[in-house]
C-alpha cells in the first residue's frame, strides 16, 4: 500500500512552502512571540541513521538509531551524548516512522516498542510491522528507566505497544486480548484494546472503544491523566478503519472528538496539559491509503479544526503540541517538510533557520515547553537521516 502517511511509512516526502496565515476559522492559540531564528544541532548516532521522536523540558531526546549491522535500537540523547536503550531480547527496538514516539517524560522515563526473542505463534504482523522490519517475533511495549528496559504486560494476547508516558510514570498504548476476532484485517487475528499501564502499582487497565466499535488504541497521555487515541474496527493500528473515531478518555468516560469529514484515519497524536489535542484526520473523500490527511487541532471550546498545509502540498500531520499552544508536524507534497503552527500562522521550519544550514528538515515530531523541536533531517551531503534539535533564539528588542 502506498503510504505517504507518516504514521505507517513515510516513503514520500513533502514540498516546500513559506509562512502562511490560516484563513479558515481556527481554535485560539495562546500568544507566543514568533522566534526569528532557530539553531539546529545534529545529534550523534550508534553507527547508522537516526531520528528523534520525543523531547522533554530538560532537552533530552528519545528516538532510535541504527547500528552498523543494520539493526535499530531505541536511543536516548542527553546533553549531546547518546545511550543505547537495548531491546527486550529481539534484534530491534524504537520506531522508524513519522510519529511522536517513543514517549519520554521529564524524568527521562522512556516508553516504546521492542521485538522479543519469542516467535508470534499466530503469524501476525501486529502494529510493529508498520514501524520497524517485521521478523515474525512478538513485539511488546517497554518502559526504560534507570538503565533498565522492562516489558509491559498485554491484555492476555501476544503483542503490545507503548506510545506515551506522563510525568507520573503512567504509560499508554495498546495490546492484544485473547479474543480471536474474525473481523480483523489479516494477518491480524487477535482483538486489541487501548491500555493504561501504571508500573509503580503494577496496574494494567483496558480503555474501551466507543459503543459499537471492537478496537481501541491509546496514543498519548497528559499530566492530568487525560488519554487520547482511536476507536474503530480491527484493522491496522493506528490507522485505516481502526481509526474510525478519534477519542478522548477522561475519568472513565470515552468521548468522540469528531473528524474532518472522512470515513477513517482520524488519529490524535498528542494532548497538552490544557487538554488541547492535535493529530491528523481524513477529509471528505479521503481514501484508505491516507494520501490526503489533514493536520487538526481539537479544543473543548472549538472542536476539531483543520490546520491547513503549505501551499501546493496535499497532506499534513500535526504530531505534538506544547503547553504554550505551539504545534509541530509535517506538510507533504513531493517531499515532506518540518512545520510549526504558532499564533494561527503556519511556518516552514527551514525558513526560521540560518540560511547556511544545508540539511533538509524532513519532519518535526516533538516540541517542549521552551520551544525546542526534535525530528528528522536529511544530511544533503551523505543522504543519511539524522536526529536534530532546533533551539529557538529569541531576539530581545
Task: List the model feature ranges, each with a label.
Residues 1-4:
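Positively charged n-region of N-terminal signal peptides that target proteins for export
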